[in-house]
């Protein structure tokens, strides 16, 4: 079918008649000029891809009519221009692609039809761990270990980059996916197949939203959805409401972009923006650099929105020049965006579009702050940190409480480290990490940290040797300007040597703490602290031994490392004493904004970006040396413990089976609120007494070789055993934190996997009960694949985080939702009952279904298949089955 909007296409420049764009102004529809800029991107993609099958004329009308349709839960398709993947989520995607080729061949189709149809960039950044720190060779040693542990995965990925068209792999040691995307991969405007169109993307990482700071619409999706986009399917999404976030004023000179984003995160969590876009506007936006905007956009998942969009303006174009982008491309980017009404002047209120709701922040009201101890939205002003931590100590166990009895608040434990005696207490800092693309992409906070380090060293201050300090920049550019500006030696002197280019501590790859420190924490039952410049601090994520974790700007990470404790009031208490015996306060070493900007102007230059990124695909010698086969079908090695052909397609036939009711299911787990994808499918270390450890031990591996769950996502046997294996999982059956459950028929307490296996052997279906925000956190496809492999047919929850719900759908697991005002407690459910879920043949999106218990009780729940497309996926047993059937025909 030809595109019914073909008449809108015209050359952007008469000199180049072969290069066209869809001129949305030719719609002559007054509604277009009132649309939020983010919605204009959705509209352009729909018009350009309209084929009356995947994208229909009615979809375009629905988007144009956004003012009304935003309130009606209407689904629209979106075909992003490209996909980005990181290696933890990318390995299972390439495994699925390889297995799909096998399945298509088995069903008589052409396996080479399975290929990405849009550009897919995979950045290897999740594998490196902080094994070595505080030594000059930390970087080399950590990279060597990364290769030793991950050689097999890396060989597989290198095979994928050669076997599949349109797939580029950025080797390990290059940087963090979102920073590499911002500084290098981002196009802003595509020039492809004779058309100009806005750059847009989805990524298999929830912080993909960082790119929204540059005016490129993008967000995180599950690996399963990303694979569908790579195969040419549009994403099906509810047309979102758009919250206009007006920024006014100018930030105080001592305030960092981190303080601004933590303030916005708390504010938007209170406003309630889950499932909505946030679009920034107002004169305050013009005060923010692209790095500042990217920091704010990066933490979008923490405030719960789908996207956090800053339309392109002059500052964006300046950033493209600063980062050494191609001058030829810069010529058409601005011209195209102006031609389609997508170029913004934040000082011109006449350009402000309509929004669902407007909220605002005066930047001058922002104060220096941190967030914690267990959630990114729990902002605490730095001036209140001591008081707040001390109130958390005694408060009831929860997001702001550790339930330490008052008589134990001043407990401490001495220990020997490096032949010297030290003391740990509640609030002692044991991890201080400058980490994560959230902040290392921002030269002002990184140079701020460097200048603070210089002043601290000059004042004779230091960091206790037992504190695990690290610096893991998101790209080589950071190290370049830290060295050129002369601050790197001072960072090293305080223990902040570069330990690797990757996510590291931010995703829990913080590596081991010194044994004496762990013993002191455990024996003293102390609430030890991690301070990091990351974006998430959920319990158990950063390190198992840091029960409190605070997000802070890079300069504050160093300040708390020097203090050695979170229990300090920087205004009244000194950081230490200098050689002359004088007290040194934080205000004495804090650099001014003018100092930072002067250094930034001098040392952050386009040549740096060009030099680093020119050689990005060839700079890693170990990667270059990897030998891989050139076959188009992958040869699965049965001895491999990293890469295994998944069982998802084993019994797949071309014919569809009608949907079946779930009869007499047992409850595997009875969970509460805010169960994250980290709880469901942890990414961190594999505990020695876990089912996954037993499996790997039986395959001849020693604990040293276990690596992490995240690195083993290409092996379903490990990942199924790692499902619900988080030591912080709180199962209401047990009333304690443990990766265990009660096997109801026998009453035995078992590891979750062992219980599920027993149910499966008896042919008994399973469900999970949960509370609000089920599946919050990372866009982890194994949090849906794992439960599927455990035999879980449905989850019954009060509400779902967006990405996780769509991942469950993509695996054919039913996301059921209680009716408003109902939950397990209100309905008197204990989880000991058996559940029958009646599934009718004539399914419709968001249909209410009957749930019957063996106690005789019945109630209704909503099946959260939100669109016809999602229903189609479910009826096929998941999105990949649907694609295989389509390709095999």
Swiss-Prot record:
Record key words, sorted: 4Fe-4S, Cytoplasm, Iron, Iron-sulfur, Lyase, Metal-binding, Phosphoprotein, RNA-binding, Tricarboxylic acid cycle
> Which taxonomic lineage is given here?
Eukaryota, Metazoa, Chordata, Craniata, Vertebrata
**One Pfam family linked to the record:** Aconitase
Quaternary structure, per UniProt, is: Interacts (when associated with the 4Fe-4S) with FBXL5. Interacts with frataxin(81-210).
Q: Example GO biological process term?
A: response to iron(II) ion
The GO terms describing molecular function are: 3 iron, 4 sulfur cluster binding; 4 iron, 4 sulfur cluster binding; aconitate hydratase activity; iron-responsive element binding; iron-sulfur cluster binding; metal ion binding; mRNA regulatory element binding translation repressor activity; RNA binding
**Residues bearing PTM Phosphothreonine:** 628
Question: Impact of altering residue 300 to S?
Answer: No effect on aconitase activity or on RNA binding
One annotated Gene Ontology cellular component of this protein: cytosol
Enumerate the cofactors the protein uses. Answer: [4Fe-4S] cluster
Which parts of the sequence bind [4Fe-4S] cluster?
Answer: 437, 503, 506
Q: What is its main location?
A: cytoplasm
The record's EC number reads 4.2.1.3
UniProt cofactor note: Binds 1 [4Fe-4S] cluster per subunit.
**Localization:** Cytoplasm, Cytosol
Please give the annotated consequence of changing residue 437 to S. Loss of aconitase activity. Leads to constitutive RNA binding, irrespective of iron levels
* This protein's name: Cytoplasmic aconitate hydratase
The Swiss-Prot or TrEMBL record describes its family as follows: Belongs to the aconitase/IPM isomerase family.
Q: What does this protein do?
A: Bifunctional iron sensor that switches between 2 activities depending on iron availability. Iron deprivation, promotes its mRNA binding activity through which it regulates the expression of genes involved in iron uptake, sequestration and utilization. Binds to iron-responsive elements (IRES) in the untranslated region of target mRNAs preventing for instance the translation of ferritin and aminolevulinic acid synthase and stabilizing the transferrin receptor mRNA.
Q: Where does substrate bind?
A: 86, 205-207, 536, 541, 699, 779-780
